[in-house]
C-alpha cells in the first residue's frame, strides 16, 4: 500500500511540475508580446501634451495627455492662415489699425493706416510669426478680431475640435468670460490635418509653409520687408513638409508639424514642450514621435470579401417563376475597389461587423441600401460600406395580378 501511495505521489508531483511549467511559459509569452508592443513607444517626452496622428485617416496613433486643454501660442496661426486662404479675394488688401500697430513682438513693425496685400501678410504670419500681421488679416476678413475669432471657433467645431477656444488670431495668451485661448494636442493635430489634407486651399497652405524666404512691400511700395522660415524641422528629417512653431509665457514652446515618407503621412502636435532655455526640446520630441510612427506602422489591406446573405423580398415578383411565393434578392458590398488600406501595427487586428435586413418589402430598386459592413479597430469605427441589392424586384400589386391572370387565362 505504501509503495502504491508513493507511486501516486510521484505521478501527482510530475503533473504539478508540468502544470507549473506550462503556466510559466504562458506568462512569459504574454509578457514578451506586451514588451514587443511597448518597447518602442516613445518615453520621457519633454512635452506635457503630445499626439502622433495618421494624417490620412485622422487616427491618433500615440498620445501623452493629448486631450488636456492648454494654451497653444502661435500654432494658432495655422487656423488663421487657412481661414484667410478660404475667405480672401484675389488681390485683397488690408490696412493696419492702431490695434494692429500695438501688437507685441514678434511683429512686422507696421505703421498706422499702412496697407498690405493679404497674400504677403500670410507669409509674414507663417514664416516669421508676426503678431501685427495676424491682426490686420483678422480685422480685414472678420471685420474685427472678435468677428474673426468667431469664424475660427465655427471652423473648429466643424472639424470636431470641441475642446478648442480661439480668442486671438495670433495665439497671444488671452482670457475672456468664456475661458482661455486654448486647445488640445489632439485638436491641434486635427486642425493641421485639415490644413494639409482636406482644405480646398491645402496647396496654397503648403506653398506658404514650405517657402524658405519671402520678400514683399506695402501696397504703395514705400517700404520693403523680408521674411525667413523659422520651422527648422523642414531640414531636420527627410519628408518633413509643413509646420508651425509657437511660444508664450503661459504656453511654453509648442509645435505642430507634418512628415511624409514611404507613403505614410504623420502629424505631430506638442504643447508645453519646455520653457527657456529649452527651445530644442520640441525638435527632439517631434523626431522621436515621427520615428516611432515610421518604424512601427505599415499600411495593410484589411478588406475581406464579405458574403452578404440573400434577402427575402415580401410580396415580390420572381421573373423566372411568377407564382413563386418566396422571392430572394442577391446583395453585395458597395466597394468597387475591393481594397481598404489602414495604417496598423503588426499586432493590431481589425474586426468586421455585418448588419443586414433579413427581409424587405417590394418593390426594391437596384443598388438599394439594405445594410452595412463596418470595420472596427479597438472598438472605434474605421470605415463603413453599404450593403446594396444587386437587382430590382417588382411588387405583386393589383396591376401585376390582372396582367398575370390575363396572360394565363385570356391569351
Indicate where each model-derived feature is located.
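Domain-terminus/edge residues, biased toward the C-terminal soluble/receptor-binding domains
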Residues: 179-411
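Sec-dependent N-terminal signal peptides of Gram-positive bacterial secreted proteins and lipoproteins
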Residues: 11-34
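Active-site-adjacent loops and short helices of periplasmic peptidoglycan-processing enzymes
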Residues: 6, 30-203
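N-terminal secretory signal peptides that target proteins for export/translocation
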Residues: 1-11
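A short, sequence-level motif marking secondary-structure junctions
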Residues: 20, 67-68, 123, 387-394
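Short, intrinsically disordered/low-complexity patches at protein termini
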Residues: 27, 84-87, 141, 146, ...
Amino acid at each position: 500500500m505504501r509503495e502504491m501511495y508513493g507511486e501516486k505521489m510521484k505521478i501527482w508531483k510530475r503533473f504539478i511540475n508540468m502544470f507549473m511549467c506550462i503556466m510559466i511559459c504562458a506568462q512569459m509569452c504574454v509578457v514578451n508580446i506586451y514588451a514587443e508592443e511597448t518597447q518602442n513607444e516613445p518615453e520621457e517626452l519633454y512635452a506635457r501634451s503630445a499626439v502622433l496622428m495618421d494624417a490620412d485617416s485622422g487616427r491618433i496613433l500615440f498620445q501623452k495627455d493629448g486631450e488636456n486643454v492648454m494654451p497653444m501660442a502661435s500654432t494658432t496661426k495655422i487656423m488663421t492662415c487657412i481661414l484667410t486662404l478660404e475667405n480672401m479675394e484675389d488681390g485683397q488688401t488690408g490696412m493696419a489699425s492702431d490695434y494692429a500697430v500695438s501688437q507685441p513682438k514678434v511683429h512686422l513693425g507696421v505703421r498706422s493706416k499702412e496697407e498690405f496685400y493679404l497674400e504677403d501678410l500670410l507669409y509674414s504670419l507663417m514664416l516669421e510669426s508676426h503678431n501685427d500681421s495676424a491682426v490686420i488679416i483678422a480685422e480685414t476678413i472678420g471685420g474685427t478680431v472678435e468677428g474673426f475669432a468667431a469664424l475660427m471657433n465655427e471652423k473648429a467645431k466643424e472639424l470636431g475640435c470641441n475642446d478648442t477656444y480661439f480668442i486671438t488670431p495670433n495665439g497671444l495668451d488671452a482670457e475672456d468670460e468664456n475661458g482661455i485661448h486654448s486647445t488640445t494636442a489632439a485638436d491641434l493635430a486635427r486642425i493641421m490635418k485639415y490644413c494639409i489634407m482636406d482644405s480646398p486651399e491645402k496647396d496654397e497652405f503648403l506653398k506658404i509653409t514650405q517657402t524658405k524666404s519671402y520678400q514683399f512691400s506695402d501696397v504703395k511700395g514705400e517700404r520693403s520687408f523680408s521674411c525667413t522660415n523659422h520651422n527648422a524641422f523642414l531640414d531636420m528629417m527627410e519628408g518633413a513638409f509643413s509646420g508651425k512653431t509657437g511660444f508664450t509665457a503661459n504656453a511654453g514652446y509648442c509645435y505642430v508639424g507634418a512628415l511624409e515618407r514611404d507613403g505614410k503621412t504623420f502629424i505631430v502636435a506638442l504643447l508645453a514642450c519646455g520653457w527657456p532655455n529649452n527651445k530644442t526640446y520640441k525638435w527632439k520630441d517631434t523626431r522621436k514621435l515621427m520615428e516611432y510612427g515610421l518604424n512601427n506602422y505599415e499600411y495593410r489591406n484589411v478588406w475581406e470579401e464579405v458574403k452578404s446573405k440573400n434577402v427575402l423580398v415580401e410580396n415580390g415578383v420572381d421573373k423566372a417563376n411568377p407564382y413563386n411565393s418566396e422571392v430572394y434578392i442577391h446583395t453585395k458590398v458597395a466597394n468597387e475597389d475591393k481594397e481598404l488600406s489602414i495604417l496598423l501595427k503588426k499586432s493590431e487586428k481589425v474586426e468586421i461587423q455585418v448588419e443586414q435586413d433579413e427581409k424587405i418589402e417590394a418593390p426594391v430598386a437596384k443598388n438599394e441600401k439594405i445594410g452595412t459592413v463596418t470595420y472596427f479597430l479597438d472598438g472605434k469605427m474605421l470605415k463603413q460600406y453599404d450593403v446594396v441589392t444587386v437587382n430590382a424586384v417588382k411588387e405583386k400589386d393589383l396591376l401585376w395580378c390582372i396582367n398575370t391572370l390575363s396572360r394565363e387565362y385570356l391569351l
